[in-house]
Amino acid sequence: VYWRDRKEWYVQVLIFEMRLLTFPGILTGSPIEIKPNFNPMIGPSPYVLINMGARFVPCMHSVDGVQNRDTGGPISWPCPDTTSNDNQNCTLAQLCGFNMPEKQNPVFPGNKTEPLNEFENQPNQWFRFIVPIFLHAGLIHIGFNMLLQMTLGKEMEIAIGPIRYFLVYFSAGIFGFVLGGNFAATGIASTGASGALFGVIALNLLDLFYTWGDRTSPWKDFGFILLDINLFYHPTNKLE
């Protein structure tokens, strides 16, 4: 009944994804990365995603080996519109986009003795903790996200209401990227709603444990949640 009565959801998703794929098409001539590598998620290149707002630590704050680099020459950053391995002649500001000031580009040679958090004119695109929730590496990526959203997410939103669901969803999504921005590899772009959806999974687990004795088949429900985690995590664990 839910699926039959809510036909508009897939139209909204389709329009949203078509809008997201328009920008990569303008930059590289194709909405899907096919050169120099093929994106198995059927989506744009990581450089396009960085330019669109993916979590990319060098765009957000000073990074060891970037701002304090004093050997090996200045870093040549890939250009957002690159379709080859040779187009590595952009500045960090050009890669990051969003009108990042040129004065925030790393200066070579950097100062090895100055603490990273005290560098002047360091990048500060803090909104990259939020924007990546709405970006995805490709159609397969958003497909797995929507699968979980329309199963466990739907049931939890009905149970707790849209306002509480909204608060949990975005809190988990934002702080997931905060943790990734502090502890994940600094040179990898990250996108997607995995952090938000793992918050939804946590709510489902809490609900299961609180109502364990009232359920007809609690172990079956628990197994279903574990299956969702396994199916959802492995295809996207390198993206988010």
Task: Provide a role label for each language-model segment.
Residues 1-133, 218:
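N-terminal signal-anchor transmembrane helix
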Residues 5-9, 143, 166-170, 225-226:
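Hydrophobic alpha-helical transmembrane segments
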Residues 16-19, 23, 180, 232-236:
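Structural signal for membrane-spanning alpha-helices in multi-pass inner-membrane proteins
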Residues 123-131, 171, 175, 223-230:
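Alpha-helical membrane-protein architecture signal
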Residues 131-204, 211:
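Transmembrane helix-loop-helix
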Residues 162, 206-223:
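Alpha-helical transmembrane bundle and helix-membrane interface signal
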Residues 219-220, 236-240:
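C-terminal transmembrane module of eukaryotic multi-pass membrane proteins
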